[in-house]
Amino acid sequence: MHKILIRNNYKPLVGKIKINGSKNAVLPIMAASLLSSSSVILHNVPDLIDVHLMSKLLESLGAEVNFMHNKNYKANHTLKIDCSNINNHVMPYKTASKLRTSFLILGPMLSRFGKARTAFPGGCNIGKRPVDMHIKALEEMGAKIEIDGYNIIATVKGKLQGKEITFEKISVGATENVIMAATFAEGVTTINNAATEPEVLDLIDFLKKMGADIEIDNTKVIITGVEALNGCVHKIIPDRIEAGTYALAAIITGGKLELEGINLSDIRCITNELETIGAMVELYDGGIVISRKNGSIKSANVATDPYPNFPSDMQPQLMSAMCIADGISVIEENIFENRFTHADELRKLGANISIEKSKATISGIKSLSGANLYATDLRSTAALVLASLVAGGETIINNSHHLWRGYEAMHEKLNSCGADISISS
């Protein structure tokens, strides 16, 4: 079991952190590489467990995947993917079941090869993330989908057919899957109520570079099927969730961090709320600087909602800051129904948190105390790290392997700015 040991040295974090390419952008783009019979080269790729799991899935289908590390620092790696010799359509259960985005391989495999078999997707246990919307949309396009225990078998005779798809609610994954499926479909596919997150737009940009015919009109995406896609070179957008997490590290410790490789426009949906609680955001050539204005952290009322609103992936980290804010804060979680698991662990540090259905009420206290904690998922682990930075004494976070699914070398980056964090297995 991986453990993180954090010692509070009462130092504000000061320094520079390089922001990686987006985890939530690179994974669907890796899946989309299946649509090309030529090589694709991806730059600004993060070195994460989920990236390597997706690489294994692609390799199991016959792809050649080459991850090239940037030896200079812990970011901006390169990934070359060649899907010219795909010879299998069955994804191994053991790997697919560990990765939520394994389901995104369904759309491109159906579109290019007419068949795919995968397991129900894994990932973080943060509540229901149903794939019903994916399945319904693909069936509307002509796919036959069977569920055999924990496996999903999808086939189509001939080509998928362009259709008008209207999602009952906004779904990033379903939007991405249908976009990829529609790339080679016969005719025009229109997606109404589509997700327009930056990561979805990055996928569309990647597909268009390869030759896809895609247009966007507000929350409508229109895809006209083409015959083939070429290879391309593409740079993954910065990870706004990683940037937001480190921004909160600066605010919580009263420090000042330069976040290199991120533009303010990339994280405006996050910094708007951070400024409300007392953050100062400054621009510089190549990134932004985050610090806390004079005084303590202010309380706030925040609700998570689809882009361009505050993202659910930042909710646990924000709660950590609210634990030591002046006054009472309320966080409403509108995306996932089981995303308050970190609250129990924050209480072990002394936090005053009450949960009622989708709302968390946090009464700020002056200080936290170190404790023995257990992580449950990726973002909750990040939240516990942030809170532990200002908890008196030592804090141990058990089951911390979740962190490496979304943050490359977080402990090294924070230590370079003054933190005292060590890792043990």
Curated annotation (Swiss-Prot):
Cited InterPro entries: Enolpyruvate_Tfrase_dom, Enolpyruvate_Tfrase_sf, MurA_subfamily, RNA3'P_cycl/enolpyr_Trfase_a/b, UDP_GlcNAc_COvinyl_MurA
Keyword set includes Membrane: no
Keywords of the record: Cell cycle, Cell division, Cell shape, Cell wall biogenesis/degradation, Cytoplasm, Peptidoglycan synthesis, Pyruvate, Transferase
Reactions catalysed, as given in the entry: phosphoenolpyruvate + UDP-N-acetyl-alpha-D-glucosamine = UDP-N-acetyl-3-O-(1-carboxyvinyl)-alpha-D-glucosamine + phosphate
Enzyme Commission no: 2.5.1.7
Pfam family, one: EPSP_synthase
Annotated positions binding phosphoenolpyruvate: 23-24
Keyword Cell division in record: yes
Pathway: Cell wall biogenesis; peptidoglycan biosynthesis
Active site (record annotation): 124 (proton donor)
Cellular component terms per the entry's GO annotation: cytoplasm
First-level EC class: transferase
Localization annotation: Cytoplasm
Biological process terms in GO annotation: cell division; cell wall organization; peptidoglycan biosynthetic process; regulation of cell shape; UDP-N-acetylgalactosamine biosynthetic process
Modified sites of kind 2-(S-cysteinyl)pyruvic acid O-phosphothioketal: 124
Residue sites binding UDP-N-acetyl-alpha-D-glucosamine per the record: 100, 313, 335
GO MF terms, alphabetically ordered: UDP-N-acetylglucosamine 1-carboxyvinyltransferase activity
NCBIfam families according to UniProt: murA, PRK09369.1
Role according to the record: Cell wall formation. Adds enolpyruvyl to UDP-N-acetylglucosamine.
Family, similarity comment: Belongs to the EPSP synthase family. MurA subfamily.
HAMAP family: MurA (MF_00111)
Protein name: UDP-N-acetylglucosamine 1-carboxyvinyltransferase
